[in-house]
Swiss-Prot record:
It comes from Buchnera aphidicola subsp. Baizongia pistaciae (strain Bp). Keywords: Cytoplasm, Transferase, tRNA processing. It is an enzyme of class 2 (transferase). It comes from the Bacteria. Its EC number is 2.8.1.-. Belongs to the DsrC/TusE family. This is Sulfurtransferase TusE. The gene is tusE. The active site is at C93.
Length: 94
């Protein structure tokens, strides 16, 4: 998927529905973190970098784990979250 410049929450909800994900405030937190990361660095974060970013943002320790992210995005946290966020998926080499 390419970056979607005219991304909005309605589009994100449609994409999430196609991924069988019911968006909650926890999902939106991750989506906006990924979008902000992409806008700052022109790439989506790997799962490792996303977890480090959550830690730096002083998130609850429970939320700073791949297990938590898998509960939100069960197929593949980065792939699904990036798709919903309208940003290209990282190649996970970082």
């Amino acid at each position: 998927m390419n970056y979607i410049p005219d991304w909005n929450e309605e589009l994100a909800k449609k994409i999430a529905k196609s991924e069988f994900i019911n968006m909650t405030p926890d999902h939106w937190e991750i989506i906006y973190i990924i979008r902000n990361f992409y806008l700052n660095f022109n790439l989506a974060p790997s799962i490792r970098i996303l977890i480090k970013t959550l830690e730096k943002m002083k998130y609850n320790k429970k939320k700073c784990s791949s297990r938590y992210l898998l509960k939100l995005f069960p197929k593949n946290p980065i792939k699904q979250a990036s798709k919903i966020a309208g940003v290209p998926k990282t190649n996970d080499c970082i």
